[in-house]
C-alpha cells in the first residue's frame, strides 16, 4: 500500500518527505485511500497489505502500474513491462492494460514481445536499431517486408507464392 502511495504523493501538494514524516494525518489517510483504490483497480485488492517484495514478478509489474496510476497520468509510459514474465503473468498484465485502454487511458508501450504487442495495440511503430521500419495497424505492420526481414529473418523464397500472404508465427509476429 505504501509503495503505491508514493505515486499519489507525487501528485499532491504535500510531497514525499512531508508524507514520510506523517505531518498531515488527514492528507496521509486520503493518499493511502487513493493508493488502495488504484491497487483494487488493477486487480490486486486481495494483496492490499502484502509487502511488494512478497508478490510474484507479474504482480509486482502490475503494482508498478498502480503506483503510476496513483499519480493520475494522462499518458501511461511503459518500457518492456512484459520482459521476464511467464505466459500467465503476461496474460494478467495484458488484461490490466486492456482494461485501462477501455477506460480511455492512453498508453505508450515499448516492448519486444510481439504477441503481447499485437494483442494490445491498435496502432504501432516498429523500429530496428533506432530506424523506423513501419507504422500502422498490427495487421498491416506484421506483413511489412522490412519488419519480416528484421524480426523473422525475411521471407522464405522456397515457399510457394500463396504461402507468402499467410500470417507467419515466429518470434511473436503472426
Where in this protein do the model-derived segments appear?
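Glycine-rich phosphate-binding loops of nucleotide-dependent enzymes
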Residues: 1-174
